[in-house]
Regions:
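Extracytosolic ligand-binding ectodomains
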Residues: 4-397
């Protein structure tokens, strides 16, 4: 009986500690985190998993007592995959909602549109998009969590095509900020390794027919194709190529990695290659990989809560995790509801993010500096292949 009483007392103490931690955070005004993210429109397949994982992480932080004894409060706004809407959302989050930081920007076009608003509003903008123009040249208030296209994707996919036997590689890209960044990286890399593209084609973001471009590619004599786009348009390019009789290997930029592309590509998706962050194939990583533990943790939590894992969940995990870690170093006596204190919080947070070193994230190991607001080294991503309707770690046979 005494043992049972002791056990009950221990459980009660533990429960009261958890409750007190949440109560402590709930007793102070929150730090507002703005999340302008694409929940509708062409980039929604990126935005939805980002929203999901940010909510998941913030719930974890708040249950642990918040940051500096304050809860984190999310204000989530749908950018609708539209640059103009993104600018309006960013301005509202900064001026009306008094966000200490804004994170979740899903695409290059929407992110680029909002840069000036964040800079003039002196508030951290954390981008989840790939264009180098977002952070080169360095903007004081803008940071990124996505590896450079030149370092994360293009060389790996071109090299894989060459190893698959391609000698005349064609390239087709979506004609927007993301695709144009990909084109620049492709041109730089093929020139570096001394090969001439068979042909380069492009298509509009809203394209529903790319048969003309694929016909040009087929007639060029290309024996390998690199497609740089997002899930729906890239799947369209793949299906069109196969239906028009293009039988050579086709590889993709990392804009396709997720369950949406596999669903849209259907039978044509089997065997295609792309690149991904490690969490997508977490359990296949060697134990020696320093990111395996955090990757497995995210994969298991995400799939348990939401089902199929998405590459883009890692972007959200990194931005909210770094934000929370660096927000904890801000002067805890500053009140985010007071205008002058809010300015100081934003400024200290920015400086703390810029000073982040060796943060073990999903997209890589981050070390920012005044001259580098991307923070990621080469070699962050791994090659993946669709096998039996799932993305798996690519191991060249």
């Amino acid at each position: 009986m005494k043992k049972l009483l002791v056990l009950v007392m221990v459980l009660c103490i533990g429960l009261s500690w958890v409750v007190s931690q949440e109560a402590q955070a709930a007793g102070k005004e929150p730090y507002v985190i703005g999340v302008p993210v694409d929940l509708t429109g062409p980039a929604s397949f990126i935005g939805k998993p980002v929203e999901a994982v940010i909510k998941l992480r913030v719930d974890e932080f708040n249950k642990a007592g918040g940051i500096n004894g304050r809860p984190l409060k999310l204000v989530i706004l749908d950018n609708e995959s539209a640059p103009a809407k993104t600018v309006l959302n960013t301005k509202k989050l900064i001026d009306v909602d008094k966000a200490v930081a804004c994170l979740g920007y899903s695409s290059s076009g929407t992110t680029l549109a909002a840069l000036e608003t964040a800079e003039s509003g002196e508030t951290v903008l954390y981008s989840h998009a790939s264009s180098d123009k977002i952070w080169i040249p360095t903007k004081k208030w803008v940071f990124n969590v996505v590896p450079r296209t030149m370092e994360a994707c293009t060389p790996m996919m071109v090299d894989n095509l060459i190893k698959q036997g391609a000698k005349k590689i064609a390239y087709i890209y979506i004609d927007n900020a993301m695709g144009q960044t990909g084109l620049e990286a492709f041109n730089v890399y093929v020139q570096r390794i001394g090969i001439k593209p068979a042909i380069i084609e492009k298509y509009e973001p809203a394209a529903t027919d790319v048969s003309a471009q694929i016909t040009h590619i087929k007639n060029s004599g290309a024996d390998g194709l690199f497609v740089d786009g997002l899930a729906a348009d890239a799947a369209l390019a793949l299906k069109t190529a196969r239906e028009l009789g293009f039988k050579a290997p086709i590889n993709f930029g990392y804009g396709v990695v997720g369950p949406e592309f596999i669903r849209l590509a259907s039978k044509y998706g089997e065997g295609v290659l792309s690149t991904s962050l490690r969490a997508l194939v977490a359990k296949e990583l060697p134990d020696s990989d320093p990111q395996k533990k955090v990757a497995v943790d995210l994969y298991e939590k995400y799939t348990k809560a939401f089902g199929d894992f998405s590459l883009y969940a890692g972007h959200g995990w990194d931005s909210i995790s770094i934000t929370a870690q660096t927000l904890a170093k801000v002067d805890p006596n500053l009140d985010p509801t007071k205008e002058e204190d809010l300015k100081k919080i934003r400024s200290q947070l920015r400086a703390n993010i810029e000073g982040t070193k060796n943060f073990l994230g999903q997209n890589g190991i981050f070390s920012y500096s005044p001259d580098n607001h991307n923070g990621l080294p080469p070699g962050c991503y791994v090659s993946v292949v669709v096998e039996n309707g799932k993305w798996t770690l690519y191991k060249r046979k």
